[in-house]
Each structure stands twice: as structure tokens, then as C-alpha cells.
Amino acid sequence: MIQSRQLEAFRPVMLTGGMTSAANLVRITQPAISRLIRDLEEEIGISLFERTGNRLRPTREAGILFKEVSRHFNGIQHIDKVAAELKKSHMGSLRVACYTAPALSFMSGVIQTFIADRPDVSVYLDTVPSQTVLELVSLQHYDLGISILAGDYPGLTTEPVPSFRAVCLLPPGHRLEDKETVHATDLEGESLICLSPVSLLRMQTDAALDSCGVHCNRRIESSLALNLCDLVSRGMGVGIVDPFTADYYSANPVIQRSFDPVVPYHFAIVLPTDSPPPRLVSEFRAALLDALKALPYETI
């Protein structure tokens, strides 16, 4: 069987045209190079060089073999390069699942910053409901997820992130627009555009209003916070939404105000539990946490 050391000797001989120069190139003795070439010729049963005194002339067979050996070494060099890039986290792919609110704009900024100095890193961002995020990440279909989380979920490691305060949205010209903070009692009798009854934020909003004895007119509900913002901008009522969606919609005609009492907006980074995350995933998680901590939203 051909040995790798024999090929490592054959290649520099072909490149330099002599045993001595090849020995100098790879920093071994000339007799050692000569012995490896003889062993290679004996192994394959073919003469690779015509010897005339101190001169070597490659045979036709040597030329054919050299092409294959070059492919082999080029492949190894490429593997070395890939391994080095992976070590630096400059190569690879990320699959991220995220529920709607952070995916609207925030995640785009995180990805843009993360891959700016990683030209060989690819990212796939899938925007799905929170429950689907949990399912997909637990099945290891995705490397990392961002989800609203209520309690533990099997197959997942969760990393809590800063909890933000939900905000109150008002249409332009609303009677409360001059207030820096809207209190629940200010909304007595108001038309309140609500999220779906199964939404955690909706439940928390209802609890905050009920604790203050506030009664609102809940004529319109929407399963999507972005639709709620649009309805507010059309003067259909006021709304309580997460700060991600409110920020994304801020260029439109809506007024954003702090809301009291606090309606917490909790979510988490989730990862599969079966194995430690690859370095690239760990670095993306760290970048994500840094970006969340830098947000100007009110925290709890």
C-alpha cells in the first residue's frame, strides 16, 4: 500500500526536479528522499524517473501520478483552510428560528452585524410562531431559537434575556398623547384593540387592566401585533404591544407611550440540549445577547 510519506517525497521531487533540492525543500536528508522514492516505485511496480548520473527525468507515468497527487494535496490544504476558518468561526451555516416580533427588524440587524466579518458564514432565518420555534429547535432542525416561553420545554436549554415593558400605542391626536406614561385607569371606556385571547401578552394586559378595575371596549382583536399597530394608526382604538413591533411600526402615524402598571414581555433564547452548541452558534448567541442588552427599550 502506498504510504503518505512516499507521496510527500514524490511531490517535491517533481516540483524541484532533483533529489537534493527536494530534500532541502522538505528538510530531510537526500538519502531519505531517495529511499522513499525507491519504495514508492517498488510499491506500484513502475519506474517513475529515468536516472542519468545525478539528473532525473520524470516518466510519463510519473506525470500522470503527479496530477493525482497534486489533487490530493490541494484537497488537504483546502481542508486545513476550512478547519482554520471553522476555528475562527468564519465559516459554516446557522439555522435560526424566531417568532414574529424580533424577526421584523431586530434580527436583521443582528445578522447583518454578525456576518459582516464572516463572509463564508450563511444564515437561514425562519419566522414561525413561538410554539413552532420550541418544537423545531428541540428536534434540532434549527441551531438556535427565540421564543416566548412559559415554563420548561423538553429537549431545550433556555437562556433568559432582558424582559422588556410592553408599550401603549395611541392614534395621532388622541386625548392621551401629551402624557409621557399612560396609566391603565386612563383607558377607562377606550376602544382597546387586543391581541388574540391565547396570546400571553393579551393575558397579561387583561390582568393589568382588571387589577385596576378598568373596563375597555374590546371590539377588535388581531392575532398579529403588526395588524394591531395598523388598526391603531387608522384611529380604530388604542393598543398594548411589545416594543419590537412598536419600534418597527414607529415610522407610521402612531404615538408610543410607556404603560403603567408594568406589563412584562418575556422571551428566551432556546438551544437543543443534546450536545454543546458549535462555536459559531455560541458566538451568535453572544452577539444576540449583546444586541438585546443594547436596545433602548424599558426593562423590568
Curated annotation (Swiss-Prot):
Q: Which residues bind DNA?
A: 19-38
> Is the keyword Repeat in the record?
no
Is Transcription regulation included in the keywords of this UniProt record? yes
Domain named HTH lysR-type: which ranges?
A: 1-59
Q: Name one GO biological process term.
A: positive regulation of gene expression
Q: Which GO terms describe its molecular function?
A: DNA-binding transcription factor activity; sequence-specific DNA binding
SUPFAM superfamilies named among the record's database cross-references: Periplasmic binding protein-like II, Winged helix' DNA-binding domain
List, alphabetically, the InterPro entries matched: LysR_subst-bd, NocR_PBP2, Tscrpt_reg_HTH_LysR, WH-like_DNA-bd_sf, WH_DNA-bd_sf
Q: Which domain of life is it from?
A: Bacteria
Alphabetized, the UniProt keywords read: Activator, DNA-binding, Plasmid, Transcription, Transcription regulation
Q: What does this protein do?
A: Positive regulatory protein for the noc operon involved in nopaline catabolism and uptake.
UniProt record similarity statement: Belongs to the LysR transcriptional regulatory family.
Instruction: Write down the PANTHER family for this protein, in alphabetical order.
Output: TRANSCRIPTIONAL ACTIVATOR PROTEIN LYSR (PTHR30427:SF1)
The protein, known as: Regulatory protein NocR
Species of provenance: Agrobacterium tumefaciens (strain T37)
